[in-house]
């Protein structure tokens, strides 16, 4: 709700800011409304579309809560756009910030700017001081952003996709405390199952199979001592039973080499405790399990463990393939599936970001009818994504299922201010044909609205800091950083690139001449 509120209010800020701008320049209420909608209506529609694309791209993530988040956020943005376009003008008719008498408006205008408009004047004064940077030193500004992008790109190489289901809960929360206690004193909070399928009846009565399983258990324990606390299988049952049948001699804690003795040992155990036997092996002894108790860790380490277990099993059981051609060893269980699922979800979110980027790029190229303008519009919005991922790399913050939400949402929302800037810039350059003049006028008409919308969005996303979920807190602060850097890119990089790449549009006079021809 807070997210949709923060996003939805952005268009309202642009329209109100534009309305006040035109009223401050002496236009009547009706004229100001016409002027602001003439300049911002298309931009508001495009920004709503790009934001919806960013939200709806989350439907590619195969997890219901994230899909619901993307779906209803996109619908909320659409409803907010309709209310802004149709309800806001009616509200301004009923409650106009200025008197309807133009003369009274002009008289009151100065008083309002001095008193009630002090905050707006303060922002405008700051913008007036920074606006010359973009058109006086466009190359220096652009190179500064390029240098920052290179530094951040190196940080991105340090980023790893890793979801830790315990660490996403903040320290001090009861659930995290419970997990930590279980890890320390109760043998581990997680588990994995290694299934050994011989493909033959009584396959697990073969001493060679059990010896291979024993070696696998030893490998798991020795290779991952910080993770594995205990492993149990039919191997332990056969060793314990054989030792018990031999007067408890420690030297008899082994797997019998003779298949007949092993079969008899397992038969005796099954008679004594059939329920426990069924936990470890099927009734026909073709399929068995190795149950591994694990401490908490991240999905990357678990996936590495699973990969190495499979490699060792392939090598160790290879000599038995001739007698057991259908022999298969695989890691499964809740933790293994959850670990692989989180990585699958993470890569799905990477794909959703890619889709959002492609669709938004095509939309920008289509709207501005210029490859150059489309690229100039897109590049400042890639910078915030570089920033958050670069910072995460340097701070060793892993990309998980929560922080990966930042990329598609950020590019969908951050591009909004770029569209507002370029739409206004196109109108000014088309009218006057002067790029510098177009930048100055655009800065003064849209700079304040861009600043306020970025602040509103940042505050809206920082609300996630209150969550007990560490992943959502990271998502909130990274999103706020992204919107702040997007603001810097829109105020400095975008106008500088417009100058450097000579982004201009046909003047209205030229269009008129073409129409006459």
Where would I find each of the regions flagged by the language model?
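Interfacial helix-loop-helix hairpins and adjacent transmembrane helices
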Residues: 34, 82-149, 430, 495-517
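Hydrophobic transmembrane alpha-helices and their membrane-interface caps
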Residues: 1-15, 373-422, 462, 492-493, ...
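Helix-loop junctions and hydrophobic alpha-helical segments within the transmembrane domains
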Residues: 22-49, 429-452
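Hydrophobic, glycine/alanine-rich multi-pass transmembrane helices and their short helix-loop junctions
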Residues: 45-88, 361-365, 387-398, 447-505
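Extracytoplasmic
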Residues: 137-401, 499, 503-517
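Cytosolic juxtamembrane amphipathic/interface segments immediately preceding
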Residues: 30-37, 120-133, 334-341, 436, ...
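Hydrophobic residues within alpha-helical transmembrane segments
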Residues: 19, 37, 41, 49, ...
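Helix-loop junctions at the membrane interface of multi-pass solute transporters
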Residues: 5-7, 13-27, 35, 56-60, ...
């Amino acid at each position: 709700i807070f997210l949709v509120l923060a996003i939805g209010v952005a268009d309202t800020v642009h329209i109100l800011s534009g309305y006040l701008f035109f009223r401050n320049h002496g236009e009547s209420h009706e004229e100001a409304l016409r002027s602001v909608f003439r300049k911002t209506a298309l931009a508001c529609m495009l920004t709503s579309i790009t934001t919806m694309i960013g939200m709806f791209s989350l439907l590619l993530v195969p997890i219901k809560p994230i899909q619901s988040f993307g779906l209803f956020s996109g619908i909320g943005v659409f409803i907010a756009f309709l209310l802004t376009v149709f309800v806001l003008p009616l509200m301004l008719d009923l409650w106009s910030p200025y008197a309807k008498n133009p003369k009274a408006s002009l008289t009151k205008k100065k008083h309002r700017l001095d008193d009630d408009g002090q905050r707006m004047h303060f922002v405008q004064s700051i913008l007036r001081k920074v606006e010359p940077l973009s058109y006086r030193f466009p190359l220096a500004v652009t190179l500064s952003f390029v240098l920052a992008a290179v530094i951040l790109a190196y940080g991105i190489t340090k980023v790893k996709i890793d979801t830790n289901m315990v660490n996403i809960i903040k320290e001090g929360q009861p659930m995290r405390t419970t997990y930590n206690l279980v890890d320390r004193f109760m043998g581990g909070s997680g588990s994995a199952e290694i299934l050994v399928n011989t493909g033959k009846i009584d396959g697990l009565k073969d001493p060679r199979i059990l010896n291979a399983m024993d070696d696998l258990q030893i490998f798991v324990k020795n290779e991952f001592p910080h993770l594995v606390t205990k492993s149990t299988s039919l191997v332990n049952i056969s060793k314990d039973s054989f030792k018990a049948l031999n007067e408890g001699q420690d030297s008899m804690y082994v797997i019998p080499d003779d298949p007949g003795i092993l079969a008899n040992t397992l038969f005796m155990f099954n008679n004594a405790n059939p329920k426990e036997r069924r936990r470890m092996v099927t009734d026909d002894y073709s399929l068995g399990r190795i149950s591994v108790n694990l401490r908490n860790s991240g999905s990357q380490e678990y996936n590495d463990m699973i990969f190495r277990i499979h490699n060792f099993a392939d090598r160790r059981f290879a000599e038995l393939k001739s007698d057991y051609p259908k022999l298969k060893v695989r890691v499964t269980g809740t933790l293994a599936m959850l670990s692989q699922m989180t990585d699958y979800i993470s890569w799905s979110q990477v794909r959703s970001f890619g889709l959002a980027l492609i669709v938004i790029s095509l939309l920008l190229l289509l709207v501005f009818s210029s490859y150059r303008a489309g690229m100039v519009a897109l590049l400042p919005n890639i910078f915030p994504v570089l920033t958050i991922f670069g910072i995460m790399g340097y701070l060793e913050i892993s990309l998980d299922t929560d922080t990966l939400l930042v990329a598609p949402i950020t590019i969908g929302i951050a591009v909004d201010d770029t569209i507002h800037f370029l739409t206004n810039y196109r109108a000014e350059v088309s009218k006057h044909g002067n790029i510098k003049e177009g930048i100055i006028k655009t800065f003064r008409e849209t700079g304040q609205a861009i600043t306020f919308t970025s602040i509103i969005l940042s505050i809206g996303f920082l609300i996630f800091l209150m969550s007990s979920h560490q992943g959502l807190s990271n998502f909130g602060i990274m999103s706020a950083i992204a919107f702040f850097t997007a603001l810097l890119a829109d105020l400095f990089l975008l106008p500088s690139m417009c100058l450097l790449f000579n982004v201009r549009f046909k003047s209205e006079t030229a269009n008129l001449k073409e129409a006459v021809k």
